Amino acid sequence: EGFEDFCREQQIPHRVFLHEMKDQTASQEHLKEILSEIEADSPGRKKGIFVSNDTHASILVNLLVRKYGKLPEDYLIVGFDDSPASRNAIFPISTVAQQIDMLATEAVKLLVEQIEEHKNSKHTPVSEPVHKMITPVLIRRETTERDLLAEDN
């Protein structure tokens, strides 16, 4: 929802595709269909594609390279989760990463707080879940930074 809210606020045209991708074959087929729709809707325009995980982003990059022999300049691709697939792809994939160290620190703090509350309140259970927001970070790699890489050469 955050992505859609941002696009609406910034008046950025966007589409959301929701498909269950159970295995590699299904993922490839769904991503091929999505790619065809995007290309039909946006000929000659830059296409920013945010994919729900790095594995599917890698499949999408592979489909584009197979089709065009390269990663076209008008495609900017971002995955999610900073998995090894994003770092090891033929074109390293830009990705949104969770800050695992901060998540772990906050989880331990919450656990310690709950243990202390439990000791002090005679075993009263926590009544409401605790929500903490850890801001993810964008790791820029070749699927969004090709213009910058070309300038460096």
Model-predicted regions and their roles:
Residues 1-4, 105:
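Short, surface-exposed alpha-helical segments at coil->helix boundaries
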Residues 3, 7, 61-64:
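A conserved amphipathic alpha-helix that caps or lines the catalytic cleft of carbohydrate-
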Residues 4-29:
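Short beta-strand elements in bilobed, periplasmic/extracellular small-molecule ligand-binding domains
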Residues 15, 28, 35-152:
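Flexible loop/turn connectors
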